[in-house]
Amino acid sequence: MTTVGFIGSGNIGATVARLAVAAGYDVVVSNSRGPETLAGLVADLGPAARAATAAEAAEAGDVVVVSVPFKAHRDLPAEQLAGKVVLDTNNYYPQRDGHVAELDQGTTTSAELEQRHLGTARLVKVFNNIHFRHLAALARPAGAADRTALPVASDDAEAITTVTAFLDAIGYDTVEVGPLSESWRIEPGTPVYGAPYGPFDNPDGTPAAAADVRAAVAAARR
């Protein structure tokens, strides 16, 4: 894997792109407003980055990070994402996305609905439970004593392996949550959402070891 595509280049998307470039990856960024609006981000990221449309970013990426509001997930380019590992950073916020009965009733998860739309893409839920400032600040080299872990969920074991390697390269350990049906354990309002990484008003964050993240995931109640 050498190229990471980005559909959505807001706080989380841009932060992951910076970490990826620092780790030696090429990145192709996109947003809903067009490549020309990303000139500043591309300049900041440097020569390893270029801007494109969402479909082009999906086509170019060996893996693709999706970081758009949940309500926009049906606009994702399923054809270009077919068969690819997709990193889903999204959360369902009813006040922003409107109410979805299946999610309000707890009969499915936002990740499962996104997987349903994407078909053969291999979706991994990740990056949705950490503030972007903490994500930028807490990256550490492999083996660091204060390395932080992030939870991941997927129905595809090979996709988990791919994402684990990517997270390791950009500075994070991984805690496997289980299939997408268990991704509710890392959604807003659960113990692992935000809290292990420190208060939002502390931009440096607090390192959260794998054991602590695993315990927070296990403590979730639906």
What is the predicted function of each stretch?
Residues 44-48, 104-105, 140-144, 192-195:
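Short, hinge-like loop/turn segments at secondary-structure boundaries
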Residues 90-133, 137-141:
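Rossmann-fold NAD(P)-binding glycine/threonine-rich loop
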Residues 116-123, 129, 141-192, 199-222:
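Internal alpha-helical scaffold of NAD(P)-dependent oxidoreductase catalytic cores
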Residues 2-3, 85, 149:
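Residues that mark the start of a beta-strand
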Residues 13, 71-74, 93, 130, ...:
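Glycine-rich nucleotide phosphate-binding loop and flanking beta-alpha elements
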Residues 46-98:
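Rossmann-like NAD(P)-binding element
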Residues 1-40, 44:
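NAD(P)+-binding Rossmann beta1-loop-alpha1 motif at the extreme N-terminus of oxidoreductases
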